[in-house]
Regions:
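Short beta-strand elements of extracellular/lumenal beta-sandwich folds
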Residues: 341-355, 442-457
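Cysteine-dependent hydrolase recognition
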Residues: 1-310
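Short, solvent-exposed loop/linker segments at the N-terminal edge
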Residues: 240-245, 334-342, 437-444
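A recurrent domain-boundary module in secreted/ectodomain proteins
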Residues: 190-193, 203-242, 302-321, 416-424, ...
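Intrinsically disordered, low-complexity Pro/Gly/Ser/Thr-rich segments with frequent PxxP/GP/PP motifs
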Residues: 284-285, 372-401, 476-506
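Short acidic, flexible loop segments centered on an aromatic residue
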Residues: 264-270, 351-372, 452-474
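Extracytoplasmic Ser/Thr/Pro-rich, glycosylation-prone low-complexity segments
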Residues: 22, 503-506, 533-760
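Terminal connector regions
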Residues: 301-314, 396-431, 500-536
């Protein structure tokens, strides 16, 4: 199943991979009955359709308890993914029902989807129920007439929780849809890592982070990619390869002719890997292979969104008498691959393949750039029949590469005719670079860097160059220009720079970007950007801006023109308010309101706003009444979010007569004179104890009343009485989030405040 899915998934249906099936059930055998499995599934359906799926079928309980009559035809038609949230065990999904025995009734052939089963016990491969649902799905069918799925992700434990499964579900699809992390292993790990962000307090032994890292498992190949649409196919452009030099040079393009960079390449023969690596930005890959007496090789190409590419290449015989039979590389560090800037010693072996002796030849060895020295006169001496000679060794240094991670060398005769072409693979430099200290506005500092060498390369006598590439900083030499540095493989070390950095009067919370260059022998061989963060020191400074440029100022930010003044606008008539429009909201309820003026938010104009009973609003309409507050940003949830106090707010029946006595009262008012629109949550009960009252409001300003440079409206959050008490449910979330949900400005989450934020 895995091989067919990877190599020829479209053989029987060209369109099945852009269809999906989502199954969900809101059920529990004790109160309360969860409602979020269907919410999560509605959200996922919309995200898949927005991503580009042509069709996403849904089978939900309620209303359907017998799910198999609907699930089986959908899978048989062909779907790329099957996603389940709800109630189940090793026997299968119970609401709606789809059990182990139902797998036998599938007839989907080679259209084998990936199953995502975020529900208890469905992947319990050690259960007395044998096979469990996951095993039945994977084992389904025969090698010639398959059925079921190609892979299955789900937990083995019987006691998983809805709130954690929802997060893992959301974070897995965030990784796959938004960050192109589509291999099963990394995608599942991304889902599990979501618990670290959304439930930071659940970090102890046996708590959620550890527990779900253990119980979620993959049946199937963890390196299998999930096709999220109809995949593209590779085209190969392969230059002839000859046995006299074994130099392989080819490129891969998409079906429309575009280069495909970072394609994972494997060169194989008879199951042995001869070479592996990634294509460069032009989709090109080069290597000199080591083999004897081979007649052909296989090239495999893998990249997300593509069917695995395969090409068989016949090794040609160019009737050359001389062959380049060996390339011997040695380095000062003793590593197999030379690092950039490292001295390399190389000796070539030339073999006479004929039965007659050869004459001496005057040649030149030429490197195609990025190598010093790059030209060597070499004499190939006369060679006896069927004998070899080792040429005198040469010494050089690579400061860059020609194609991918390799440099190209050629041996040419006196007429310029190329006798041999070869490639030398270089260790790719991979560094993490961070400033150790935070800068302060209007200060001068000599920065230290924490540098982590993530590669196997050794680097010695390296100078570090520092250049600002954003406004707000300048650098000057401090006289210690002779400082040199060494970087040991797979280790971190601190390094003093030879520069003084002068910071302007930049804002706290700003990021100043510098270019870090590594230089040796006067040649820069590595460059990378690093950010110096200007840390906010105390609560009386604004919270740093988000990606778009929103800052958060509160009334404790002394000396800033944008700092707001608290001036409560009461709309609830029971407490002296007037003119407000009243919305009586139920538990987990919302109302859509037309705003009195267009409001620009993150560069987009909106005319309506969804106001939710749980202390949040969104400019993009949202019919799902999310009550569990998440961090900002979080892929699942309302889009274009305003969260003045996102938390689970409740209605109650005080006397037990079955009728609600305390509603969630929301009011809105257009203050035309002052160009502002006010939305108040009045004395709403916190779901933590159903006693604590929360009163807060949003004020949106018209551009005519409070203009900004970008045209985006100013947003005020005001708090009359607030108690952030919900200790069992991540307290509250306060902040804003972009319409695309890929960034935001988080003021507080789970009682942890951003630098500069004042406690509510």
């Amino acid at each position: 199943k895995t091989i067919q899915y990877a190599r020829n998934p479209l053989a029987y249906d060209q369109n099945w991979l852009d269809r999906g099936l989502i199954v969900a059930g809101n059920y529990a055998n004790t109160y309360p009955i969860p409602i979020t499995p269907k919410w999560t599934s509605y959200w996922l359906r919309d995200e898949l359709l927005n991503y580009g799926f042509n069709e996403v079928d849904t089978v939900f309980y309620p209303p359907l308890q017998q799910g198999a009559p609907y699930i089986i035809p959908a899978i048989n038609e062909g779907v790329g993914i099957v996603n389940y949230r709800g109630w189940g065990d090793a026997n299968g999904w119970h609401y709606p029902e789809f059990h182990v025995d139902d797998v036998n009734d599938l007839n989907n052939g080679w259209l084998t989807p990936v199953f995502f089963s975020y529900v208890c016990n469905s992947n319990d491969f050690a259960n007395n129920v044998d096979p469990c649902l996951a095993e039945a799905i994977i084992r389904g069918g025969t090698p010639t007439v398959p059925k079921g799925g190609v892979a299955f992700i789900g937990p083995s434990d019987l006691h998983t929780s809805t709130k954690y499964n929802n997060v893992i579900n959301a974070y897995m699809y965030d990784a796959m849809l938004n960050y192109n992390i589509v291999e099963l292993g990394p995608a599942m790990q991304a889902g599990q890592s979501g618990l670290v962000k959304e439930f930071p307090a659940q970090s102890g032994p046996g708590e959620a982070q550890e527990f779900y890292a253990n119980v979620y498992n993959i049946l199937g190949d963890p390196s299998l990619q999930v096709y999220l649409d109809t995949p593209d196919e590779f085209n190969f452009n392969i230059q002839p390869i000859y046995s006299s030099e074994r130099f392989l040079d080819f490129s891969v393009t998409s079906s429309n002719g575009d280069p495909v960079p970072q394609t994972v390449i494997s060169i194989m023969n008879n199951g042995d890997i001869l070479s592996k690596g990634n294509t460069d930005l032009d989709g090109r890959y080069i290597t000199t292979l080591e083999f004897e007496d081979l007649t052909d090789i296989d090239i495999y190409a893998n990249k997300s969104g593509f069917v695995q590419g395969h090409a068989n290449v016949v090794i040609g015989d160019n009737s050359s008498i001389l062959t380049l039979s060996n390339i011997d590389i040695s380095t000062l560090s003793g590593n197999q691959l030379p690092a950039l800037s490292e001295t390399v010693n190389m000796a070539l072996t030339i073999k006479n393949e004929s039965n007659a002796g050869t004459d001496a030849i005057q040649t030149e060895l030429v490197f195609m750039g990025n190598v010093l020295p790059n030209l060597f006169p070499i004499e190939i001496p006369s060679i006896s029949p069927n004998s070899s000679v080792i040429l005198p060794p040469i010494t050089f240094t690579c400061y860059g590469t020609n194609v991918g991670e390799s440099v190209i060398g050629k041996i040419q005769d006196s007429d310029g005719f190329t006798l041999f072409t070869f490639a030398i693979e270089v260790e790719k430099p991979v560094f993490g670079i961070d400033f150790i200290d935070s800068g302060l506005p209007s200060s001068i500092l000599n920065p230290e860097l924490l540098i982590t060498n993530y590669s196997g390369g050794s680097y010695d006598d390296i100078k570090i160059l520092l250049t600002p590439i954003s406004e707000g900083a300048s650098v000057s030499s401090n006289g210690s220009s002779n400082l040199t540095n060494s970087f040991v493989p797979f280790e971190s070390s601190t390094h003093q720079t030879s520069y003084d950095v002068s910071l302007d009067n930049v804002a706290y919370g700003s990021d100043i970007t510098f270019q870090i260059d590594f230089e040796k022998d006067g040649i820069v061989f590595f460059s990378q950007e690093a950010i110096m963060h200007i840390e906010t020191p105390a609560i009386n400074y604004p919270v740093a801006p988000n990606n778009y440029g929103y800052w958060a100022y509160d009334n404790t930010d002394v000396g800033f023109a944008a700092s707001p003044e608290f001036s409560w606008v009461e709309l609830d008539p029971q407490f002296g308010g007037e003119n407000g429009t009243h919305y009586q909201l139920d538990d987990d309820d919302h109302v859509d309101i037309q705003m009195p003026f267009p409001f620009q938010y993150h560069g987009v104009n909106y005319e309506n706003i969804t106001v939710n009973s749980n202390g949040w609003a969104s400019f993009v309409p949202c019919d799902i009444d999310y009550f569990w507050n998440m961090s900002i940003p979080m892929y699942m949830g309302p889009k274009a979010l305003l969260a003045p106090f996102s938390d689970d707010l409740e209605t109650i029946d005080t006397n037990g007569d079955g009728n609600i006595d305390r509603w969630i009262n929301v009011y809105s008012w257009y203050d035309e004179e002052n160009g502002r629109f006010v939305i108040e949550w009045s004395r709403a009960l916190n779901g933590y104890d159903e006693i604590t009252e929360e009163t807060f409001e949003i004020i949106l300003y018209d551009q005519n009343a409070m203009p900004t440079e970008t045209g985006d409206g100013v947003i005020d959050f005001q708090y009359l009485h607030i108690n952030d008490v919900d200790v069992t449910k991540n307290y509250s979330t306060v902040g804003i989030e972009s319409p695309n949900k890929n960034y935001g400005l988080q003021y507080v989450f789970n009682n942890v405040y951003s630098p500069g934020a004042a406690p509510l």
